[in-house]
């Protein structure tokens, strides 16, 4: 009996981005290594290109020079007339777009893995932008299964107003890889090993797929963003409370109505309101202070993928 599956085109071109944020050093370190010796990321019949996305920020070990490269891959910025007056990252975004995009172009990259670190206690995290992408749900299922018993979480940023224009979004299949906790400007061996394994399993999945392996229907648990929460602020806009100790480092754990969220300097606890349990992520992320984000609320749900198989086999 012939199984019912979705026939997908073979994957031909993959890019691995490091240094989208220049002080998130695991991706920088790995990509620089793979540029020197890329044997471990090569797979038969697959073009895999490691790439430093924001070299100036990497050189200065800072998140960005003029603006956040991972927020400006929208039509407005990509369509601006190139000039020296443009912010460095906008010019760089246009260069990257022409090298790796456009999303549905004939020569565009099939998959871009964008490597990030977080100061939050998020462990191994895969970031998904489209809940209907059978191929990526299958890939994430494979990565999660391969990493077990090490947990690997899936963060779904599909949202009408909270989704942002990522560097990787120019690929047909964009994949964010976020591993922490790791301070900015620091390398940790355990975090590096985890990210390296995530890339290995992802490339193995692509190789098996291209070789004709059929992946049966699967389901994965994901955490979908529903709201970003700012710190409490005083009348001057200054932060008036910090993340409560009970919430610190509790990414992915349930936060119930009435549970402590923030703590003021005079000892007052500010609890979660409403009547819904949420799952916080990016708790107390250092890079998000400037974005006025103390953490993001997510809701937990299941995503299903149909069986897939490469169309050339």
Curated annotation (Swiss-Prot):
Substrate binds at residues 63, 70-71, 164-168, 178, 288. InterPro entries: AspA/AstE_fam, Aspartoacylase, AstE_AspA_cat, Aste_AspA_hybrid_dom. Binds 1 zinc ion per subunit. GO terms for cellular component: cytosol; nucleus. It is an enzyme of class 3 (hydrolase). Keywords: Cytoplasm, Hydrolase, Metal-binding, Nucleus, Zinc. SUPFAM superfamilies: Zn-dependent exopeptidases (SSF53187). It catalyses: an N-acyl-L-aspartate + H2O = a carboxylate + L-aspartate. Gene3D superfamilies: 2.20.25.160, Zn peptidases (3.40.630.10). Its cofactor is Zn(2+). Its EC number is 3.5.1.15. Pfam families: AstE_AspA_cat, AstE_AspA_hybrid. It is found in: Cytoplasm; Nucleus. The active site is at residue 178. Zn(2+) binds at residues 21, 24, 116. GO terms for molecular function: aspartoacylase activity; hydrolase activity, acting on ester bonds; metal ion binding. HAMAP family: Aspartoacylase. Belongs to the AspA/AstE family. Aspartoacylase subfamily. Homodimer. Catalyzes the deacetylation of N-acetylaspartic acid (NAA) to produce acetate and L-aspartate. NAA occurs in high concentration in brain and its hydrolysis NAA plays a significant part in the maintenance of intact white matter. In other tissues it acts as a scavenger of NAA from body fluids. This is Aspartoacylase. The lineage of its organism: Eukaryota, Metazoa, Chordata, Craniata, Vertebrata. The gene is ASPA.
